[in-house]
Amino acid sequence: MSQLYDLRLRIEEKIKSAGLDPMEMKGKIGLRSGKLLAFITPTTPDDPEAIAKLKLAAREVLDLNL
């Protein structure tokens, strides 16, 4: 499993546990990171820049430190 996919799962769990609208939150994170969560699969290759952007977007949108 890739690091990007692991981040996706952790973000989705945070959205679910906080009772937030998944479409809205995933959309906001996708716009900020430039990476749509739906397209991150277990075989998505890790890219350090994409990982950093996704972590930053999760912190800004969900106040989630990954």
Q: Which residue stretches match the model-derived regions?
A:
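A short, Lys/Arg-rich alpha-helix, primarily the initiator
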Residues: 1-18
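Generic structural marker for isolated residues within well-ordered, non-membrane alpha-helices
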Residues: 11, 22, 55
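Recognition helix of helix-turn-helix/homeodomain-like DNA-binding domains
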Residues: 31-47
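DNA major-groove recognition helix of helix-turn-helix/homeodomain DNA-binding modules
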Residues: 48-66
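Short alpha-helical "recognition helix" segments of helix-turn-helix
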Residues: 24-26
